[in-house]
């Protein structure tokens, strides 16, 4: 397990979370402002604001912070690709629970990859709101060299 270590130490089968929190309008508005998402359903009236699907990237960081408090490790990670399936809109003020599982770790062309699958659920009734699969490059190891 990577608990208490670096994100670069994650191995298949490691469980991240669950972490519970309440989605705040401030986080949604600031994220949307930074990403130039100016549509009213992201930055309008508070009772109408929904979470943009890509905001789940912050949940991955939330899980890393709890499971791997030492940070990224000797090699920074690069967000490589992701797939996000939204099952239901997530409104501001919702109580949420996010959890993840490390599914794969592999090397391709000298680059180490880690695949994490996450689920964002309603903390009230367990409904699946968003399913997310993320692949990050953890390190590059040149032939015969260190990362």
Predicted regions span which residues?
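Hot-dog-fold acyl-thioester-processing enzymes
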Residues: 1-81, 143-147
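HotDog/MaoC-like acyl-thioester-processing domains
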Residues: 1-7, 86-147
């Amino acid at each position: 397990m990577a608990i208490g270590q670096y994100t670069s130490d994650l191995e298949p089968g490691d469980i991240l979370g669950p972490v519970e929190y309440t989605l705040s309008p401030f986080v949604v508005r600031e994220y949307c402002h930074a990403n130039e998402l100016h549509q009213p359903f992201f930055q309008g009236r508070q009772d109408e604001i929904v979470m943009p699907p890509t905001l789940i990237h912050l949940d991955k960081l939330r899980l890393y912070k709890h499971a791997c408090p030492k940070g990224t490790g000797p090699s920074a990670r690069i967000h490589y690709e992701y797939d996000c399936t939204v099952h239901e809109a997530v409104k501001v003020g919702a109580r949420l629970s996010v959890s993840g599982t490390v599914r794969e770790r592999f090397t391709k062309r000298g680059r180490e990859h880690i695949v994490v699958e996450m689920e964002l659920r309603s903390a009230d009734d367990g409904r699946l709101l968003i399913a997310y699969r993320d692949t990050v490059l953890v390190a590059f190891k040149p032939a015969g060299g260190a990362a």
